[in-house]
C-alpha cells in the first residue's frame, strides 16, 4: 500500500472558499486516498462479515452554493447507496478525522434497530472502549465521548425522533502524528471497525 496518511494540506482543504475550488481540492487531494484505503477496508469488512460490502465516496452532488464542511467514504452492503443502510465511514472535518459506524436519518427501519440496541445496552457498554465517541448528527462536529453521553437517552431519541441519528466510533485530531503514518492509521481504522462489527450485526437481528 502506498497510502501515506493524511497531511495538514488535506485538512486545509476545508478553508478553501467557493464550492468549485473546494470540490476540486477534495477530488485531487482526498478522494484518491479514500479510493486507496477504501478498497482495502471494504475487502476487509466483506471478509469479516461474510457478505459483499461496497465502497461509496461522497460526491456532494446536491450542493449548489455552500462548499462541504467535511467529506467521507462509506462502506455498506448495498451497491446503489449507503444512506438507507447501516454503514462504516471514514472522513475529514477541518480539525479531525472520524471513523464511524453510522446510522443516519434516512434509515427506513431505525426504530427496529434502536430497539435492538436498547435491548443490548449492557453489551454495547462492555464492547465499546472508553475512548470512543458518539454523535447524534452527522452534519455537526459536536460528538461526545461515550463516557459522557446518556447512551439510553441517545438511543431512545434515535428511535423516536425522525431526524435523530446515531454514530459511534473514534476521532483523531488533525495534528495527531498517527495521521501521518499510513500503515499505522490503516491498522487503527481496521481495529475500530472490528470493534464495531458486533454492533453492526446487532442492528440486523
PLM regions: where:
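Charge-rich, low-complexity N-terminal segments
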Residues: 1-98
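A general structural signal for short secondary-structure junctions and capping/turn motifs
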Residues: 64, 91, 124-126, 157-159
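Long, solvent-exposed, polar/charged low-complexity segments
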Residues: 1-46, 140-205
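Short, hydrophobic/aromatic alpha-helical segments in well-folded domains
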Residues: 76, 86, 120, 192-195, ...
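Intrinsically disordered, low-complexity regulatory segments enriched in Ser/Thr/Pro
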Residues: 79-115, 163-167, 171-175, 180
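Compact, glycine/acidic-enriched structural inserts
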Residues: 97-153
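A residue-level signal for beta-strand positions that form part of recognition/binding surfaces
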Residues: 72, 131, 165
Amino acid at each position: 500500500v502506498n497510502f501515506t496518511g493524511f497531511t495538514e494540506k488535506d485538512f486545509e482543504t476545508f478553508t478553501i472558499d467557493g464550492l468549485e475550488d473546494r470540490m476540486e481540492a477534495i477530488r485531487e487531494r482526498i478522494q484518491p486516498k479514500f479510493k486507496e484505503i477504501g478498497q482495502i477496508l471494504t475487502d476487509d469488512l466483506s471478509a469479516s462479515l461474510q457478505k459483499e460490502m461496497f465502497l461509496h465516496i461522497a460526491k456532494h452532488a446536491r450542493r449548489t452554493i455552500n462548499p462541504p464542511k467535511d467529506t467521507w467514504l462509506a462502506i455498506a452492503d448495498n451497491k446503489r447507496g449507503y444512506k438507507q443502510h447501516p454503514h462504516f465511514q471514514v472522513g475529514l472535518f477541518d480539525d479531525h478525522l472520524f471513523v464511524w459506524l453510522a446510522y443516519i436519518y434516512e434509515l427506513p427501519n431505525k426504530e427496529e434497530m434502536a430497539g435492538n440496541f436498547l435491548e443490548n445496552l449492557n453489551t454495547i457498554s462492555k464492547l465499546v472502549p472508553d475512548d470512543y465517541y458518539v454523535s447524534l448528527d452527522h452534519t455537526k462536529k459536536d460528538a461526545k465521548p461515550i463516557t459522557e453521553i446518556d447512551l439510553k437517552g441517545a438511543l431512545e431519541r434515535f428511535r423516536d425522533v425522525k431526524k435523530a441519528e446515531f454514530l459511534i466510533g473514534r476521532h483523531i485530531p488533525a495534528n495527531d502524528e498517527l495521521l501521518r503514518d499510513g500503515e499505522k492509521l490503516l491498522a487503527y481504522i481496521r481495529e475500530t471497525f472490528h470493534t464495531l462489527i458486533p454492533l453492526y450485526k446487532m442492528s440486523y437481528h
